[in-house]
C-alpha cells in the first residue's frame, strides 16, 4: 500500500502557490485494507475515505469507463491492481495529473511540469471528452492562471460541443463551475475560452449574441458590445467585487443584442430590453436569488444610475423606491459598484471617475433624514392616515432637491471648463 499526494496540491506546490486542499490516492489497497487501518468511508460514488487523524481525503486508485452521455454516466474500477499511472490518466489536464510520493519526488507521466512552465492547458487523454464538465473546468483554469489552451485540446472541446455533450450539462454543475470561474483573477478569459470552443453559444447564448453588435465609438472606443461586456466583467474582478456583482456585470448589457438594426450603433432602451434575457439566464442557470436579483436590477437601472445628473428630484425619489433602496441599501450600493465597472470597462477609459455613485448614496442618505415614523404618527393623530405616504414623499423630496441642485450646478461648472 502506497500513498501519493495528487492533483491540485501538487500543481499549486510547483507553481509556488499556497496549497489549500490536499487529496491523496492510495495504490495497492482495497476498501477492506482502508477500513482495517481506521479510515472512514465517505464516498457515495467513489471509494473515498477520511484519514483517522488528519481527516484528509484518501481515494483508492481507480479507472473509469464512460457508460452514458453527460457527466454522470460513468462506471469505475477500484482495486489493488490499479496503478498510479492508470489513476492519473483518467484526470482532465496534464497539470492536474501529477503526484508526489512520500520522499517528495514528483511523478509526472504526462508532461504536467512542462505544460506548467509553458503556461499550457492540455488534456491527458481522449477520455477528456467523456465528461462535459471538463469544458467548464478548463475555461475556469484558464481564468485562474491565464494559461493558453493547447490547440488539440480546444479542438477536442469544439468537437464535444458539436456532439451535443454541452447540452447534457445540468444547471447545478454549470453554475458551480461558472461561479468559481467568475471569482477567478481573470474571469474574462473564461468567457473567451467558452466562446472559442462554441460552448458559450450553448450555455449563454444571450451573452454570445453581444459579440459583433456595434456601439457608438464616442462612448465605446472598443465598439463591440461583447468586448465591452468582457471589459466590464474584468474591471469588476480587478475591483475585487463579489460574485453577485461580477455576475451582474456580465449580464448588464444583454439588451444590446435586441437593438433593432436600423438604429445601431445607438441602443435606446437596451436597459429595459435586457430584463427578459437576464431572467432567462437566471432561470437556465438556476442562479442563486441574490445573484439573480442584482443582475436584473443592474440591467434595468444602470442607464438611469449613469444619468443621475439629468434627473428631476421626483424621478430620483421614484428610482430609490422602485429599486428598494430604502429597505435594501446594501444591494443598492452593490448595483452602483457594477456601474463603476461598466463605466470603466471601456477601451482607454479604465480610470474614468464615477461621481454618480457617491451622489446616489448621498441622495439616499438625505432622503432617509425625513423622519417617516414621526410623519406617520402626526398624520394618524390628525386623522389623516391616508396621507402618510404622500407626506413622507414630500419630506424626502425636500431633502433631495437641494442636493440634486448642487450636483447639477457642479456638473455644469465642470463641463464649461
From Swiss-Prot:
CDD domains: HDc, NT_ClassII-CCAase. InterPro entries: CCA_bact, HD/PDEase_dom, HD_domain, NT_sf, PolA_pol_head_dom, PolyA_RNA-bd, tRNA_CCA-adding_enzyme. It comes from the Bacteria. ATP binds at residues 8, 11, 91, 137, 140. GO terms for molecular function: ATP binding; CCA tRNA nucleotidyltransferase activity; cyclic-nucleotide phosphodiesterase activity; magnesium ion binding; phosphatase activity; tRNA binding. CTP binds at residues 8, 11, 91, 137, 140. Its cofactor is Mg(2+); Ni(2+). Monomer. Can also form homodimers and oligomers. This is Multifunctional CCA protein. It comes from Neisseria meningitidis serogroup A / serotype 4A (strain DSM 15465 / Z2491).
Amino acid at each position: 500500500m502506497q500513498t501519493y499526494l495528487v492533483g491540485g496540491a501538487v500543481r499549486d506546490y510547483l507553481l509556488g502557490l499556497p496549497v489549500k486542499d490536499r487529496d491523496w490516492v492510495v495504490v495497492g489497497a482495497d476498501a477492506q485494507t482502508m477500513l482495517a487501518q481506521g479510515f472512514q468511508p465517505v464516498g457515495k460514488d467513489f471509494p473515498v475515505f477520511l484519514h483517522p487523524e488528519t481527516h484528509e481525503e484518501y481515494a483508492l486508485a481507480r479507472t473509469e469507463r464512460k457508460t452514458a452521455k453527460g457527466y454522470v454516466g460513468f462506471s469505475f474500477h477500484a482495486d489493488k491492481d490499479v496503478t498510479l499511472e492508470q489513476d492519473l490518466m483518467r484526470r482532465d489536464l496534464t497539470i492536474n495529473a501529477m503526484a508526489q510520493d512520500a520522499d517528495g519526488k514528483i511523478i509526472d507521466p504526462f508532461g504536467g511540469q512542462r505544460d506548467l512552465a509553458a503556461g499550457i492547458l492540455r488534456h491527458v487523454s481522449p477520455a477528456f471528452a467523456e465528461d462535459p464538465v471538463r469544458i467548464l473546468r478548463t475555461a475556469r483554469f484558464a481564468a485562474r492562471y491565464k494559461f493558453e489552451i493547447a490547440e488539440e485540446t480546444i479542438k477536442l472541446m469544439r468537437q464535444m460541443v458539436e456532439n451535443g455533450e454541452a447540452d447534457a450539462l445540468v444547471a447545478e454543475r454549470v453554475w458551480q463551475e461558472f461561479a468559481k470561474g467568475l471569482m477567478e483573477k481573470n474571469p474574462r478569459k473564461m468567457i473567451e475560452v467558452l466562446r472559442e470552443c462554441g460552448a458559450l453559444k450553448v450555455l449563454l447564448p444571450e451573452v454570445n449574441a453581444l459579440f459583433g453588435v456595434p456601439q457608438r465609438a464616442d462612448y465605446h472606443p472598443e465598439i463591440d458590445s461583447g468586448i465591452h461586456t468582457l471589459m466590464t466583467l474584468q474591471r469588476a474582478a480587478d475591483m475585487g467585487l463579489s460574485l453577485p456583482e461580477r455576475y451582474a456585470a456580465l449580464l448588464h448589457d444583454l439588451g444590446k443584442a435586441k437593438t433593432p438594426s436600423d438604429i445601431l450603433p445607438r441602443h435606446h432602451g437596451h436597459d429595459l430590453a435586457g430584463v427578459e434575457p437576464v431572467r432567462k439566464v437566471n432561470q437556465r442557470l438556476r442562479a442563486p436569488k441574490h445573484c439573480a436579483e442584482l443582475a436584473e436590477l443592474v440591467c434595468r437601472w444602470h442607464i438611469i444610475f449613469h444619468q443621475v445628473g439629468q434627473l428631476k428630484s421626483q424621478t430620483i425619489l421614484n428610482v430609490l423606491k422602485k429599486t428598494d433602496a430604502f429597505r435594501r441599501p446594501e444591494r443598492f450600493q452593490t448595483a452602483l459598484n457594477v456601474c463603476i465597472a461598466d463605466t470603466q470597462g471601456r477601451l482607454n477609459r479604465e480610470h474614468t471617475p464615477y461621481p454618480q455613485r457617491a451622489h446616489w448614496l448621498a441622495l439616499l442618505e438625505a432622503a432617509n433624514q425625513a423622519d417617516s415614523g414621526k410623519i406617520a404618527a402626526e398624520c394618524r393623530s390628525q386623522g389623516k392616515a391616508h396621507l402618510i405616504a404622500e407626506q413622507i414623499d414630500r419630506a424626502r423630496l425636500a431633502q433631495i432637491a437641494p442636493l440634486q441642485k448642487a450636483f447639477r450646478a457642479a456638473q455644469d461648472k465642470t463641463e464649461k471648463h
